[in-house]
Amino acid sequence: MTRGTAPPATALLAFLLIGETLGFNGWLAVIAIAVGIVALSADALARGGLTGATAAGALTNTGIIVIYTLIDGLGARVTGSGVVYVAWMLAATAILLFPLMLAFRGARFVEELRKAWLFALGGGALALASYAIALWAMTLAPIGLVAALRETSVLFAAILGAVLFGEPFGPKRWVALVLIVGGILILRLAGS
């Protein structure tokens, strides 16, 4: 639910705060992608997975995603490079978190880092590349559109879950797939 509500909220806030416009096709694409993403969770919602507490948590998380997406998108625009912005953000995070991890986890943290340094380095490099690409795109296109496209990764997770782990991929998920892919096609074919 969070991943589906964040793109239209991001696009709306980008319009209200920085005057970014999407046009009809852009809004249609964002809404189609968002509805498709929410539809992926339809089975869980139907089983009573949405309570007042979980809805509040989901909407709070939506707010956090919207805020960091706008801040990071604008930061990338100011620096002129998604890569530079992400590199500085990751460096600042490491500088702040490394001493905290040492303080709270001590020798255990050092041992875990020693054992998994290559995995951590690879994961960090992939995270840097992935987010830098998204932020680079935000220097060229409206933040709301990039935010919507970025969230389509949940579709790949659903497909991999079905293929690799035998998770069900019934009619509701097919409708979600059509909506998400339709939204992407609207963006591409309309030149948005």
Which functions belong to the PLM regions below?
Residues 35, 42-57, 91-123, 128, ...:
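Membrane-interface interhelical linkers
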Residues 1-2, 21, 77-84, 133-152:
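Structural motif at transmembrane-helix junctions in multi-pass transporters
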Residues 3, 8-13, 19, 63-71, ...:
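Specific transmembrane alpha-helical segments of multi-pass solute transporters/efflux pumps
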Residues 2-16, 92-96, 130-133, 149-163, ...:
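Alpha-helical transmembrane segments of compact multi-pass small-molecule transporters, enriched
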Residues 12-16, 20-21, 74, 78, ...:
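Membrane-interface helix caps of multi-pass small-molecule transporters
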Residues 5, 27-31, 56, 60, ...:
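Hydrophobic residues within alpha-helical transmembrane segments
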